[in-house]
Amino acid sequence: IVVIDADFSGRGYDLRTTEKNIQLYNQLSGRAGRFSSESLIVYQTLSPEDITLNELIKNNPDEILKKELISRKENSLPPFCRLIAIIISANNQSLSIEGARQIKTRLSKIIGLEIMGPVDSPLLKIKKKFRSRLLIRFNEKSLKQKMVSNLLNSLKISSKIKLTVDVDPVNFS
């Protein structure tokens, strides 16, 4: 079995890239072993030094998951925190950014939130709409999430702006 372009980095801004790559490896190795006792999986990559890829080649997925959890804890990522992504869409980029700034100003009144952004979304324009993002990080689950929800529901924003809220986002695109 040959895996083309097996670069396991976080392309696509997906928090679960490592987990998905382990699942893919398990699926491929299971299929390869169906037909004969000896099988070979070949990875083509631009990053042969990639830690995830090398641990998979050594058939050591548990080590990958341990390292992933340590990294997530050190960087305050789920499951060690909660995240809420807010995507602000508008017909022009300046309106999108300005809407995001106003929302950030309002959210900053809630103590205990770390608000990152606004930044351009990695997928800046979809269906002729410019997108900006805010990412909110916090520790307590229900109280802060409820406060953010209440604040967003009470916002009086321009009808030219659309908000999309993603609680515990899987990716950041």
For the regions a language model picked out, list residue spans one by one:
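Accessory helical-bundle/CTD segments and flexible terminal tails appended to RecA-like ATPase motors
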Residues: 1-15, 27-173
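Short, conserved loop/turn and helix-capping segments at secondary-structure boundaries
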Residues: 15-22
